[in-house]
């Protein structure tokens, strides 16, 4: 998927970001979660908004199976006020989302992971090794897709298998990088 960021089989970079309440959230320690999904998203991108319900449904459904989800917004809030921490907090509902919504103000975490779009999903196994990277499913306009690629990756990992496909092209709005 490119020279920057991490590739399949590589360990997750460090992540310590504030959530919508200001509390710092980190990745689980190896072995603490059956799998971890780090999903780049935002408040204004039509692709991210179209996939939102599918991602949050998966987060709620897989929580009881030990899967941890984190949503990250790395957009430049100066140029895109809809993605400011205040706007993120106004949109966020923990019960509905099923995951924390994190603000990557410096964009350092997005760069370390190699995130490019909203959405852009990184699915890690229990040892925090990247096992799936890409889109939630094949069509942001078709809710019936139900985040099929994401769910397939999680089912494979929970069964001790490698996801197939392991990579799909992330489709969405580009991350709005700082100048």
Residue ranges with predicted function:
Residues 1-158, 163-167, 174:
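Chalcogenol-based redox active-site neighborhoods
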